[in-house]
Amino acid sequence: MDINVLTIDATRIAIQERQATATAIAESFYKKIEAEDGEINAYLTLSRDRALAQAAKIDAIADRGDDLPRLAGLPVAIKDVISTKGVRTTAGSKILEEFIAPYDATVVQKLEAAGAVILGKTNCDEFAMGSSNENSAYGPVRNPRDKSRVPGGSSGGSAAVVAAGTAVTSLGSDTGGSIRQPASFCGVVGLMPTYGRVSRYGLIAFASSLDHIGPFAKDVKDAAIMLEVIAGRDPMDATSAEVAVPKYSDEIGKPVRGMKIGVAKEYFGEGLDPEVKASVEASIQNLAKAGAEIIEVSLPHTKYAIPTYYLVATAEASSNLARFDGVRYSHRSKEAKTLSEMYRKSRDEGFGAEVKRRIILGTYALSAGYYDAYYLKAQKVRTLLAQDFDEAFAKVDAIVTPTTPTPAFKLGEKADDPLAMYLADIFTVTADLVGIPGISVPCGSSKDGLPIGLQVFAKHFQEATMIRVAHAVEHALAAV
């Protein structure tokens, strides 16, 4: 069996028809990881015992001839900011180097209940803060499409394992583009659901009003199936929504004829790579040929999105990361002689430079005398951004944009320029700020063979619409 072409359905059918066992499939993936991941560095921890125990359960179901669960035997990887009971969970940080999660995140529980086999935990920017996966305490992840380039961040490891074929699907988190941007850079599908669509219980918090969990997959259908499994109300997360979960995979293949699709003019201006622009515009033309009506829309406050995001996100991070103090969890400084010294030295030794930078910025934004000037003003602009999208969605069913301004950049290219790194998220942060769903789907390649992604936005809880449009883009590209 060629594990490189496995999908969710193909995996389940192969096990059901006894073409392969779940155990054999899992072992094949571990062999591939051992052979190939050393150079990519996408996995931080492998959960072999847990995975093989789960695979054995699936094989027992198949042996009895019973119906297999939806994700039976599916090899999945989990971003290392999501708790997995009994498995090391580091958030890419030295401060959690030896932390063993005491419980499973809700999304992990749901995946295993549906039959998925969790291979291990993926590398990420420390506490999900970054756009290149160069901020991990455990070394950078390399892009499987070009190992001299970044995979994107912060969920770079989760995108890379799908692109490299060392997992069939994976989970990541998205706070400012951390699913969609790496999906674009690695040439896979990355889906960020509406805020509240998927439980955040068990996610190590970066910015609680912006954090989302979502899937990576090779194609839109598998991303849709993954969302069906992990979505839904969770009593353990007060922000999760009591909204029925549709069968998103039913949208695959449905026509876009008659749909109104918006093109946001602010996303096609200065700074957009010409090859990215050409690929995205070609996909928009394909949607028009398929019968969609293309309408230009305006999102005028987009230019304020980056400063707004970095004020809101860092303010929330400074509060959330206060819990890592040397008293609980993992790292405690051995040099400290007093309690205050323990706090200071443990955090200084445990946090990396980018995390420290964001904690300082967020603490400053929340401090007396600056709260109104910065944080409160950012929240007001956030409201204006939401109004922009409300006005646009009054005219259209979905909005398409480039996912990123450029294809994947070189390792080290932006590492010493935080502002240049932050600007890499300019097309993705708006969806997080207003809580709408977004998906990145491959739409072409640069002359150097680097993947290019197209992004689709939809109204709150209208992931089905977004998936239909994304699949139409995918289908048109496959037909070329």
UniProtKB/Swiss-Prot annotation:
Q: Tell me which residues this entry annotates as catalytic.
A: 79, 154, 178
Claim: Transmembrane helix is one of the keywords in the record:
no
Pfam families per the UniProt record, alphabetical: Amidase
Reaction equations catalysed: L-glutamyl-tRNA(Gln) + L-glutamine + ATP + H2O = L-glutaminyl-tRNA(Gln) + L-glutamate + ADP + phosphate + H(+)
Region spans: Disordered: 133-156
Which terms under GO biological process does the entry name? translation
- Provide the Gene Ontology terms for cellular component: glutamyl-tRNA(Gln) amidotransferase complex
A molecular function (GO) term: glutaminyl-tRNA synthase (glutamine-hydrolyzing) activity
| Subunit record text | Heterotrimer of A, B and C subunits.
Which HAMAP family does this one have?
GatA
Q: What is this protein called?
A: Glutamyl-tRNA(Gln) amidotransferase subunit A
Instruction: Tell me which species this is from.
Output: Koribacter versatilis (strain Ellin345)
Query: Which gene is annotated as encoding this protein in its UniProt record?
Result: gatA
